[in-house]
Amino acid sequence: MCLQHGLSVQKCAMAQQRIIDNTRMYFIASPYEEKNLNHHAYSYKDTGILKMTGIGRYDGLVNNDQKQILITPTWRMYNAMPVTTSEGEQRSYNPEFKTTVYYRIYNDLINNQKLIETAKRTGYAIKYLLHPILSAQVDDYTPDPYVEVISSVGDMSYEKILTESSLMVTDYSGVQFDFAYMKKPLVYFHPDELPAHYDDGGFFYDTMGFGEICTTSDMLVDTLCEYMENGCKMKPKYIERVDDFYHYDDHNNCQRIYDEIMKFQQQVDRDKLRK
């Protein structure tokens, strides 16, 4: 049974494939996941394995806005050390990290005085959350004292920081889908100097993304300041995209997953009796 930590809307057949994984049930939240996973590379089409239930952890995503801006980009293969433990966990410290364009762009952002002064004046905190794989680099950042840089390991709660944030800035991180589920505004930062993290799959940011796409730091800061000046409300255009993307938004996902598992187990039991 597959309970994903993210949504399968990008090309990921190298990591997920029914025959290799021996998957019997795959729980999904969006018709766009279903469309992507029905590609022949995954071997799910016409198997009945894909179950449109919603994602269980989304049941706990209830908005608890504490007036904070969350900046949380994903990682890049070239700025992390090779994997030595489980994939997805914090990797060893990379002594070359501070020489990367990735570091320069984001360290500059968390020192941008226009952004910080607007946040102060409008009453928003700013938090920069590292991807778990890059959390060993936390002390490399030199933020303005107003900005809190957070390592996403240990007792850090994603649910807490997502529900308490007013707006999210990300590039390609899968937590965008958690945040959008609460219909809170997102802004994408896709600087030309940084290559995309994923190949195109079933999610296209220009037509399906849940917020504006900014390609320069100045554009990003201007957009964030505008949102803060106007109370950080998701725009109707993007609310429509959220409604189109998710099959359910009723916080009953765990119950549907449980029901599907019980149906599967009952069928297994019946099959045993026939033998």
What are these regions (language model features)?
Residues A29-Y32, G54-I55, P132, Y172, ...:
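Helix N-cap/beta->alpha junction signal
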Residues I19, T118, K160-I161:
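Structural alpha-helical scaffold elements that stabilize or flank donor/cofactor-binding regions
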Residues D46-T47, D140-P145, G174-Y246:
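Catalytic binding pocket for nucleotide-activated donors in carbohydrate/polymer assembly enzymes
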Residues M1-S8, E87-F97, K184-P195:
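A short, gly/pro- and small-residue-rich
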Residues D250-K275:
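C-terminal alpha-helical cap of glycosyltransferases
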Residues K51, G56-T142, C214, D249, ...:
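Conserved catalytic-core segment of nucleotide-activated headgroup transferases in glycan assembly
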Residues P132-F177:
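Donor nucleotide-activated moiety binding/catalytic core segment of transferases
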Residues M1-G60:
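Active-site and donor-binding regions of nucleotide-sugar-utilizing enzymes
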